[in-house]
């Protein structure tokens, strides 16, 4: 029997999908990311979405101003695609190094997505330009047709929208974000080097029974929603396979406690404080610790064409207790796994 490792040293990871919000929420949640992760792909779905180079530069400056002293962190900005976005704005931002990627939200698919795209074929000229300049397209992969069951929206998106995009633009780099289904995992595994996917800790650790059986747990509610166990197991198998098409993207999405614990609660899991220990715990359960570094720190940079980080982080087998809540002015934010203990801690 192989002895369990007591320490894990990996290249410093990056988070390829995060919501940092703005103002007081930004300054509250950012340190949990900037302490551990070197870079993060920052989602553009603020209340006023990031659709211009100027707004991206201003948001990046607000993020950098909130990074605590001693943390080395680079926010990678994204452009929010809309029905009327000017292709010139997109290409200028990418060529100037302001935009790392562009984000496609189908209109009304998730938080602050009302400005999203309602007619995806109508923005094919943008995709053509992105393919030409090598700019990645990040996709929230759910259809928004009210007639489609919420648990089926990701699988339907593959057939109706994603496959036609890939057929039309075969060399467009696409990240299928926060995948939640066996359909998506199989689709990415069957793809090529132009298709990647991020996977969150909550979708690896939990399924819809954890959220709904014995009482509703609003702090596990996110979009895309947790699916049945068979889908969870497929995601776990995908990351344990060692395929370089899957990489770390927490989709950490904080909301104030009262906005989660309400009669119509918001979607989003604030997992940044526990993200790396949570991923390590999953990979250990899967006997796949040999693939943890690639998932966290190598596959993402390779897909984006960016250098891997030079420095390392160390995980130690020391119990790590998640706080019950984190102060947010006069309110609070409830973190993922609140009050629970993980086997791994990041060595400070």
Swiss-Prot record:
* Binding-site list for substrate: 19-21, 45, 140, 223, 255, 267
For the keyword Isomerase, the answer is no
Catalytic function, reaction form: (S)-dihydroorotate + H2O = N-carbamoyl-L-aspartate + H(+)
Active site annotation, chain numbering: 251
Query: Cofactor comment in the record?
Result: Binds 2 Zn(2+) ions per subunit.
Q: Where does this protein act, in terms of pathway? A: Pyrimidine metabolism; UMP biosynthesis via de novo pathway; (S)-dihydroorotate from bicarbonate: step 3/3
- Give the domain of life: Bacteria
The cofactor named in the record is:
Zn(2+)
**Entry GO MF terms:** dihydroorotase activity; zinc ion binding
State the Gene Ontology BP annotations: 'de novo' pyrimidine nucleobase biosynthetic process; 'de novo' UMP biosynthetic process; pyrimidine nucleotide biosynthetic process
- Pfam families tied to this protein: Amidohydro_1 (PF01979)
Q: Which residues bind Zn(2+) 2?
A: 103, 140, 178
State the UniProt keywords alphabetically. Answer: Hydrolase, Metal-binding, Pyrimidine biosynthesis, Zinc
Q: CDD domains this protein is in?
A: DHOase
Which E.C. number(s) belong to this protein? 3.5.2.3
Any one Gene Ontology cellular component term annotated for this protein: cytoplasm
The EC class name is: hydrolase
Task: Please tell me where Zn(2+) 1 binds in this chain.
Answer: 17, 19, 103, 251
User: Which protein family is it in?
Assistant: Belongs to the metallo-dependent hydrolases superfamily. DHOase family. Class II DHOase subfamily.
Q: What does this protein do?
A: Catalyzes the reversible cyclization of carbamoyl aspartate to dihydroorotate.
The annotated subunit structure for this chain is: Homodimer.
Name of the protein in question: Dihydroorotase
What organism is listed for this UniProt entry? Yersinia pestis
């Amino acid at each position: 029997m192989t002895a369990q490792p007591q320490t894990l040293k990996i290249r410093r990871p990056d988070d390829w999908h995060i919501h940092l919000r703005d103002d007081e929420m930004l300054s509250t949640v950012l340190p949990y990311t900037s302490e551990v992760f070197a870079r993060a792909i920052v989602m553009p779905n603020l209340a006023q979405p990031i659709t211009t180079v100027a707004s991206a530069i201003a948001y990046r400056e607000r993020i950098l101003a909130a990074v605590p002293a001693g943390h080395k962190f680079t926010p990678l900005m994204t452009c929010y695609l809309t029905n009327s976005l000017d292709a010139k704005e997109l290409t200028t931002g990418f060529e100037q190094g302001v935009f790392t990627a562009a984000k496609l939200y189908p209109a009304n698919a998730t938080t602050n997505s009302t400005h999203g795209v309602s007619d995806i074929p109508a923005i094919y000229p943008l995709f053509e330009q992105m393919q030409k300049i090598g700019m990645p397209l990040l996709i929230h992969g759910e259809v928004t047709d009210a007639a489609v069951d919420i648990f089926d929206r990701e699988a339907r998106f593959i057939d109706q929208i994603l496959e036609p995009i890939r057929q039309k633009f075969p060399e467009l780099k696409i990240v299928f974000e926060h995948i939640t289904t066996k359909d998506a995992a199989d689709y990415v595994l069957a793809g090529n080097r132009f298709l990647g996917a991020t996977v969150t800790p909550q979708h690896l650790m939990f399924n819809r029974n954890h959220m709904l059986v014995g009482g509703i747990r609003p702090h596990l509610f996110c979009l895309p929603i947790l699916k049945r166990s068979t889908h969870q197991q497929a995601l776990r198998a995908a990351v344990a396979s060692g395929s370089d098409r899957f990489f770390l993207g927490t989709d950490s999405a904080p909301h104030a406690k009262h906005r989660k614990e309400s009669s119509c609660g918001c979607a989003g899991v604030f997992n940044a404080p526990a993200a790396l220990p949570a991923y390590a715990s999953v990979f250990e359960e899967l006997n796949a610790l040999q693939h943890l570094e690639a998932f966290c720190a190598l596959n993402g940079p390779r897909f984006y064409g960016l250098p891997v980080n030079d420095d390392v982080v160390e995980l130690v087998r020391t119990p790590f207790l998640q706080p019950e809540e984190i102060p947010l002015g006069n309110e609070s934010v409830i973190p993922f796994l609140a009050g629970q203990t993980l086997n791994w801690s990041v060595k400070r």
